[in-house]
Amino acid sequence: MRNPKSFCVVAGFVRLPKSSLGQARYYSIPNDVSIPASKRKFIPSSGTYPKGFLVAGAHAGVKESNTQFPDVALICSETPCSAAAVFTTNKFQAAPVQVSKQVLEKRQGTGIRGVVINSGCANAVTGKGGLEDAKMMSAKVDECNGTPSTGPQDTSTLVMSTGVIGQRLPIKKILDAIPTAHSNLASTHSTWLATARAICTTDTFPKLLSRTFTLPSSPNRQYCLAGMTKGAGMIHPNMATLLGILCTDVPISPSALKALLTHAVSRSFNAISIDGDTSTNDTIALLANGAAGGEAIITTSSPDYAAMQTILTSFAQSLAQLVVRDGEGATKFITVRVCNSPSHADAKVIASTIARSPLVKTALYGKDANWGRILCAIGYAQGIAEGTVVPERTSVSFRPVDGSAELKLLVNGEPEAVDEERAARILQDEDLEIVVDLGGGQKGEKGLGGEEGLYWFCDFSHEYVTINGDYRT
């Protein structure tokens, strides 16, 4: 989400010498040609999608500069769903966030028919008029579904928007596009992929995943999970410029669904960072229509719940990681793993602090094994329990992607003699893992725990500054 006045279409950035993977950014993705070659490997060539869900995109022209490409998306279920969502913690919550919260609260997470999304305008900080626009979008989808609402407070469709902050939606264009999208609803892979494209802004590729699985109570029954997300900048925990829609055909109660989503998001979408900014619109929604049948997941104590929690969390992590891989100007994908912590929460705080550090991010862009910056970030992490970080027990290393031995940088608070040539080779790779061991490898020692926290982030490049300097903020 970007701030007021105009949306700047950025094209044709000059390639900077040190940036090998960053790409020019456009308002939306027009066709396959515009997708960078290095990113095409992340786009699925096929998929299996949950029963009873239909999707489509349509062109509304939310931005005047967009004369042909889809910028309105629909995800609809043929039957009412259980639904849960996690929203931005930003105090200036956009109109679609407020309306979606109202829909879920009014219906207590049941009877939801789908989601409508527009890209190009955030409908944030737009007052009562913006709220009415979001409600009209929800009501229009209900009308197309043949279940018109009895009033603006009784809709069954969630609403999401992404784009420029402080501008009103061209609501007539969007309301005209919704029936067009609805008439094209389908369940093919190409339609899912096109719908994922329709929600993009500065993304360089559409982010879509799907998978099949079974559950303990129905080992011979195939279930499906699909998800799409968008985001490339203003990404930081507790939701940033990030939209995500996950759908499954497993029957799940609203309370169990909420618990599943909360657990998964805390370990996925709330464990990524690109630039540390938290925005106004961000929403991750999970819909379950039960179309595949089988025993419903009602409580959090069942074997099916435990299995679904593992499946959903892993899936959400994979989806969230695609956002980091598309970070604005990014040349690296970094995993930071903090282990041997007394608590998962403290491990995650430390990992988050490292991921947010501009000095760490710029050092990695420069291929500099400057472990002092990592150590500094560990040392100033806020809100962790006393005794979590003990300098004499702390170790830091780089874990290469080729499976070779870790490059130890710091062991039990003492610096290692770093092989700079090997460090340079490791830092040439796109992927890197930083391991922070708070127990000096002494897992189980009194006062230490075995808890772990993971975080995913990217580096800061010259191109990040170029993109955001040219994009009205």
UniProtKB/Swiss-Prot annotation:
A Pfam match: ArgJ
Positions of the catalytic residues: 241 (nucleophile)
Which InterPro entries does the entry mention? Arg_biosynth_ArgJ, ArgJ-like_dom_sf, ArgJ_beta_C
Q: Which residue positions hold the site described Cleavage? A: 240-241
Q: Which GO terms describe its cellular component?
A: mitochondrial matrix
Q: What is its main location?
A: mitochondrion
Q: Tell me the Gene3D superfamilies matching this sequence.
A: arginine biosynthesis bifunctional protein suprefamily (3.30.2330.10), ArgJ beta chain, C-terminal domain (3.10.20.340), L-amino peptidase D-ALA esterase/amidase (3.60.70.12)
Please describe the post-translational modifications of this protein. The alpha and beta chains are autoproteolytically processed from a single precursor protein within the mitochondrion.
Taxonomically, the superkingdom here is Eukaryota
Q: Where in the cell is it found?
A: Mitochondrion matrix
A single GO molecular-function term is:
L-glutamate N-acetyltransferase activity
| Site feature (Involved in the stabilization of negative charge on the oxyanion by the formation of the oxyanion hole) residues | 162-163
Pathway info? Amino-acid biosynthesis; L-arginine biosynthesis; L-ornithine and N-acetyl-L-glutamate from L-glutamate and N(2)-acetyl-L-ornithine (cyclic): step 1/1; Amino-acid biosynthesis; L-arginine biosynthesis; N(2)-acetyl-L-ornithine from L-glutamate: step 1/4
Note whether Transcription regulation occurs among the keywords.
no
List the keywords (alphabetical): Acyltransferase, Amino-acid biosynthesis, Arginine biosynthesis, Autocatalytic cleavage, Mitochondrion, Multifunctional enzyme, Transferase
- Residue runs in coiled coils: none
- Reported EC number(s) for this entry are 2.3.1.35, 2.3.1.1
Which residues of the sequence carry a binding annotation for substrate? 201, 230, 241, 328, 468, 473
Which leading EC class covers this enzyme? transferase
Q: Which GO terms describe its biological process?
A: L-arginine biosynthetic process; ornithine biosynthetic process
- Any keyword Kinase? no
Q: Which proteins does it associate with, and in what oligomeric form?
A: Heterodimer of an alpha and a beta chain.
Protein purpose = Catalyzes two activities which are involved in the cyclic version of arginine biosynthesis: the synthesis of acetylglutamate from glutamate and acetyl-CoA, and of ornithine by transacetylation between acetylornithine and glutamate.
The similarity annotation says: Belongs to the ArgJ family.
Protein name per the record = Arginine biosynthesis bifunctional protein ArgJ, mitochondrial
Source organism of the structure: Ajellomyces capsulatus (strain G186AR / H82 / ATCC MYA-2454 / RMSCC 2432)
